[in-house]
Amino acid sequence: MNTVNKPFRKKDAMQLVTGQPVYMDDLVPADCLIVKLLRSPHANAIVKSINTAVAKKVPGIEAIFTWEDVPQDARRYTQAGQTYPEASPYDRLLIDRHVRFVGDVVAIVAGKDDKCVDKALKMIKVEYEVLEPVLDYHTAKDNPILVHPEDNWESLCPVGGDNKRNLCAHDECGSGDIDAVLADCDVVIDHVYHTKACQQAMMETFRTYCSIDLYGRLNVLSSTQIVFHARRIIANALHIPKSMVRVTKPRIGGGFGAKQTAVCEVYPAFVTWKTRKPSKLIFTREESQIASTPRHEMEIHLRLGANKDGRIRGLDLYTLSNTGAYGEHGPTTVGLSGHKSIPLYSNAEAFRFTYDVVYTNHMSAGAYRGYGATQGLFAVESAVNELAAKLHMDPFKIREMNIVHEGDVMPAYYGAVNTSCTLDRCLAKVHEMINWNEKYPRRDMGNGKIRAVGMGMAMQGSGISGMDVGSATLKVNDEGFYTLLIGAADMGTGCDTTLAQIAAEVLECGLDNITVFGADTDTSPYDSGSYASSTTYITGKAVEKCALKLRSQICKLGAQLLDCSENDVEFDGKTVFTSADPSKSVSLGDIATASMFGHDIPLEVTETHMSPLSPPPYMVGAAGVEVDTETGEVKLLEFDACVDCGTPINPNLTRVQAEGGILQGIGMTLTENVTYDQRGWPMENSLMQYKIPTRVDVGKVRVEFENSYEPNGPFGAKSIGEVVINTPLPAISDAIYNAIGTRFYELPITPEKIAMAVAEKEGAV
């Protein structure tokens, strides 16, 4: 292959590294209205009265909007960017009189500059009827205090939700008699695993600019992963026709799932629609910490049964998920905690997976890389590591005995067949990379320092089977260069580049010969959006189909110009020539020119792709740590990983994706945490309190690939974006156990917890 599986530089690399104006705030006019939000100081309250009269008199203030400007009996909406029919409940109003978490919106203020808006915010007088909040998600279900007591709460899908029970979603599924199987097992690992909420903490905070175009339509420029869903969400929130909304995206400074929710778009959109003046809203870092969409806090009760020889026979998993004040992504993230963890051990005789998603008066949770699988894999893989220790077996060996293989049916993965898999080879590769036999389980280095290793596996999916849609439009321009129009959003992942590589491979041209444009709801073909690990697998396949069809059209017009049958010509990327006589040819440039006059064969093609399958990528990771038993400090000396993502379209970008995801998983394991005080106030409201790891906080990170070939993906590709975050959690946790002999069932594992565990073990506590 000429371009696929080759390490091309990102198409936008030079623009980004030289600081060119490519992000939202670089592109908006300086004289637009500044929009800011007044937020609730209470976790649960009713706005009894709100006085904006004095604030409106501040010079420069254009408008102030409150719940009185939003019909409270109107149909609600969700800010979750999801494919139809939208699993997340319609439980929001643009401004609700009932505020449900600390940071919920009370008023929207718009003015000519920051100074006047900040002054006006301080002058708004609000009287609240403070209500008792639901802050413990263990007691939320069937609690007499309702987070959503309203009657116009609406669930579009049968997800088991009931707002009068504080229940966002509920389901259960299984195969076989799990209770009988577990009763017959020699060993049962039975624990509750707790993963806290954590923030995506992308460099670029939430931001949106809105204006009215010459047709009177609302134009929205937003840092979003989901332009088409954002259009629907804005229209629903403002109760205007979708045809009156256009959404485009600039370059995005990271998202990791946060921007799969329309966190900020509706507020400047409302201001601009009402005032007919351009406006922008840029979240501060504090706002992005206290009023965004962090990962769902989950508690997972897992029972895992096995025989004495290490054969895993059954898994019983119950997940309790805290969706917070609103239900964005609540019904969908929770499913992955079981459906993307249990299938790793599909040879088990039985499984059961049950879950509840509950409302609380915490910040609304949402999408974050891994999307529920991360939490479930921490539980399942930690249990398998504990099983190995209990049976005195090597963690690699016990997995070799039990893992899913290519061709296996996966009952817990909706009964799908595992169409491509090199998980066994990934295990062998990581075993070799970290030099496991020499380092496992621990080495005492003296001076209270112990080095140890641990490992874990992961799987994810490639898009949402039977639902996600990706589309692409390809056209030949004069002189024979191509334009690729996509609806997927490049969030810094390089999807513009990888999709162009797929097209270039089919069309046998150089990568620079393809310009990429996206995403714009007016001009791009429909795409579900850049989430669910779908871009390469779903949109990439649409690009491949589109390029093949365009290639056929080029040959058809070329044959017409050569006065012969289409079956008698070939195309080498530069010319169309007759098979019998290659000297009889016509250049691509001449074909492009001919398409513009006197011919009716179009050189513009649009193709759409939907896959009934979501083939899992797989990953194995191993961590080497050094634990200081006196201070509890953990140094990550190395992390070695091997990924099966099918055919990597661009190995450089694929490796960078893996390295970034691993770092995020390390943070979730050791430092990152979202906590609340007794009033429901978020404690980590800046990056001083919310500790994300930097590159200097970790040692060597090495990533290799064991390529499978996925027959349903473009050139054999599967996804890469999410699976990479999942293995650090069980791997580092097990390494710490091997170092100090104490297992941790709650994340993050902080130095304080480790020091206390060591002291307790030594009898000091």
Where are the language model's segments positioned?
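Thiamine diphosphate
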Residues: 232, 253-276, 280-282, 495-503
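Extended active-site and interfacial segments that coordinate phosphate-rich ligands
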Residues: 14-15, 122-129, 133-135, 225, ...
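Glycine-rich loop/linker segments at domain edges
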Residues: 6, 12-15, 82-85, 161-208, ...
